[in-house]
Amino acid sequence: MEYAAIVLAAGQGKRMKAGMNKQLIDLNGIPLIVHSLRLFEEDAACKAIWLVVSETERQTMEKLVAEYQIGKVKGLVNGGAERQDSVYAGLKGMEEAEIVLIHDGARPFVAKPILTKLADEAAQSGAAIAAVPVKDTVKLADKNSVARTVERKNLWAAQTPQAFQYELVLAAHEDAKKHGFLGTDDASLVERLDKRVTIVESDYLNIKLTTEEDLLFAETILKKRENQL
């Protein structure tokens, strides 16, 4: 199923403590955001990429897109104060598509079959997310004490991309905006409309680079892939 992608690169990533937007951090000689953009550039089903950026870094991002020849980027959109604002800006700024995949630019290791499954599932059901079963035991806390242990077998850790029929996710964002609801991902906005969100099982390599330790893990993944070539 053909789709368009919104890639989010407007956040500053303060937990990375890099003193710069983590999207620009060098990862094996290439900026992190370029690794993520190439996921979609190299997928034949992706017909357009809309890159959401910080206004102050717009020129830098434009140069990277040109330098690394990411030809599917059809436009750059200025992000907002919150992630949700940035996604909404991307939805409003893009050319309408039947299916849209929304992806965090700090996740450079999505497997191509996941992109295909997400787009196909969204076309069928309206909404689909990449996710993995939770491996750790999860405790519900009351301040510094354990209130109870949560049953793990039904818990999934949501990732991106998250795929939607365009009209559905736009309506979900507009409803959330109208009612002042701030969600932690786009699927949560669709859930508010009592719409079904399908899970597409992903893998544990699809990490979001958030801390300095994540960078070490990412470099290990890249080196392993190079050795397999």
Swiss-Prot record:
Keyword set includes Plastid: no
- What are its E.C. numbers? 2.7.7.60
The question of whether Magnesium is a record keyword is answered with no
Q: Which reaction does it catalyse?
A: 2-C-methyl-D-erythritol 4-phosphate + CTP + H(+) = 4-CDP-2-C-methyl-D-erythritol + diphosphate
Which SUPFAM superfamilies does the protein's record reference? Nucleotide-diphospho-sugar transferases
Molecular-function GO terms, alphabetical: 2-C-methyl-D-erythritol 4-phosphate cytidylyltransferase activity
The record's section on InterPro entries has:
IspD, IspD/TarI, IspD/TarI_cytidylyltransf_bact, ISPD_synthase_CS, Nucleotide-diphossugar_trans
**Pfam families recorded for this chain?**
IspD
The record's Gene Ontology biological-process terms are: isopentenyl diphosphate biosynthetic process, methylerythritol 4-phosphate pathway
Q: Which Gene3D superfamilies match?
A: Spore Coat Polysaccharide Biosynthesis Protein SpsA, Chain A (3.90.550.10)
The alphabetical list of record keywords is: Isoprene biosynthesis, Nucleotidyltransferase, Transferase
Q: In which pathway does it act?
A: Isoprenoid biosynthesis; isopentenyl diphosphate biosynthesis via DXP pathway; isopentenyl diphosphate from 1-deoxy-D-xylulose 5-phosphate: step 2/6
UniProt-annotated site: Positions MEP for the nucleophilic attack, residues? 152, 208
Site described as Transition state stabilizer, located at 15, 22
> What PANTHER family does the record point to?
2-C-METHYL-D-ERYTHRITOL 4-PHOSPHATE CYTIDYLYLTRANSFERASE, CHLOROPLASTIC
Annotated function:
Catalyzes the formation of 4-diphosphocytidyl-2-C-methyl-D-erythritol from CTP and 2-C-methyl-D-erythritol 4-phosphate (MEP).
The text of the family note is: Belongs to the IspD/TarI cytidylyltransferase family. IspD subfamily.
Q: Which HAMAP family match?
A: IspD (MF_00108)
Q: What is this protein called?
A: 2-C-methyl-D-erythritol 4-phosphate cytidylyltransferase
Name the species this protein comes from.
Answer: Shouchella clausii (strain KSM-K16) (Alkalihalobacillus clausii)
This protein's encoding gene: ispD
